[in-house]
Amino acid sequence: MHLPAILPWGAADGFSKQMLLVILSVVIIATFFLLAARKQQLVPGKLQFAGEAAYGFVRNSIAKDIIGGKDFMKYVPLLFSLFFFILVNNIYGAIPLIQLPSFSHVGGAYVLAAIVYLTWIAIGVKKNGIKYFKLATVPTGVPVYILPIVIPIEIISNFLVRPVTHSLRLFATMLAGHLIVMIAGSGIEYLVMQENVLLKGTSVLVLVGAIAMYMLEALIMALQAYVFTLLTAIYIEGALHADSH
Amino acid sequence: MNQTIISAATEGTNPLVPNPWEMGVVLAGFAVLFYIVVKFVVPMFEKTFAERAEAIEGGIAKAEKAQAEASAALEEYKQQLTDARAEANRIREEARAEGAQILADLKEKAAAESARITAHAHAQIESERQAAVVSLRAEVGTLATTLASRIVGESLSDDARAARVVDRFLADLENQNAGAAK
């Protein structure tokens, strides 16, 4: 399901609104944080304070709390970029007239999940060598006769299912929210057009329900950005400390 | 909007099949954002955090140092005060002892001086009395002789005789005096 392209107008494959929004999100995030960080003072102004609070949230509440240790600073840029990239692209869905969460198109979610997938495998191999794959799939303290069952499960859950759920969770929630808002809007439009007054009146119920769904969607948009970043931090932490799991 | 849904539904495309162009845009956009974050945003924020932590910790360290210095100075002052008190006590004791010593010396000296003066006076009085006696003896003798010669009209110019007479007279006098004194 793709919106018509902007360039060339209406074509199936071309420069679409979704692509424009993705590029715009990069500009918004970079501009905001560069402005907030530009004039750094020990006692921050309003903009700097907002930037520091946002940066500190990812740095301390996600990276430091999950990864911890003295290594966590290495992964702050990735987590920070992921969180705000997904957050802004999701919030698009809650802004009137834009109303298109970029990740309701599955391609972007695949790309981000793939980046994270390759990153945590690379970290695990770099940290533990090639035996990382053994550490990640053979749990310690399990009786030998259960291992033939456990090892395939671990391989499937860690290396096959994990990136799929990571990407589809984001994509599906955004698409579902997008569809619900869109269907509610169309439904209201359809009901208002009816000749029957009683039927016309039910559009109010749909409107109330749509507003509630809109609030819920706005919450889920922020929440999914957090969940995606949190899971990334958990995967990285698991790869770093594979020997102690 | 109806049109969109209908077209989406009738299009029959699978929503799980990605558009490669969109993937490319997301990848490129994320790469640019990541580069900016790594290169500028994180270092700038971390620099501020570090500076702020240093400012706070530096302030605390400075305050602790000042506190330590102040208590050291207080200790020193207390020590000096104690020393000064002890010194003052010592000086006072010394002065007291010295004063007593000086007083005793002076008393001794005064006593000696007075004894000396007394002895000297005694000696002088004795010698003056002696001189007076001698001179009196001579004068009184002459006077008495002249008087007697006048009275008795007898020439008593013979000195030896006269002296004998006078001596006898004086001896009588002394004997009388001595008898009276007794």
UniProtKB/Swiss-Prot annotation, chain B:
InterPro entries from the UniProt entry: ATP_synth_B-like_membr_sf (IPR028987), ATP_synth_b/b'su_bac/chlpt (IPR002146), ATP_synth_F0_bsu_bac (IPR005864), ATP_synthase_B_chain (IPR050059)
UniProt keyword annotations, A-Z: ATP synthesis, Cell membrane, CF(0), Hydrogen ion transport, Ion transport, Membrane, Transmembrane, Transmembrane helix, Transport
Main location: membrane
MF term (GO), any: proton-transporting ATP synthase activity, rotational mechanism
Membrane topology, as annotated: Single-pass membrane protein
NCBIfam families (alphabetical): ATP_synt_b, PRK05759.1-3
Protein name in UniProt: ATP synthase subunit b
Native source organism of the sequence: Arthrobacter sp. (strain FB24)
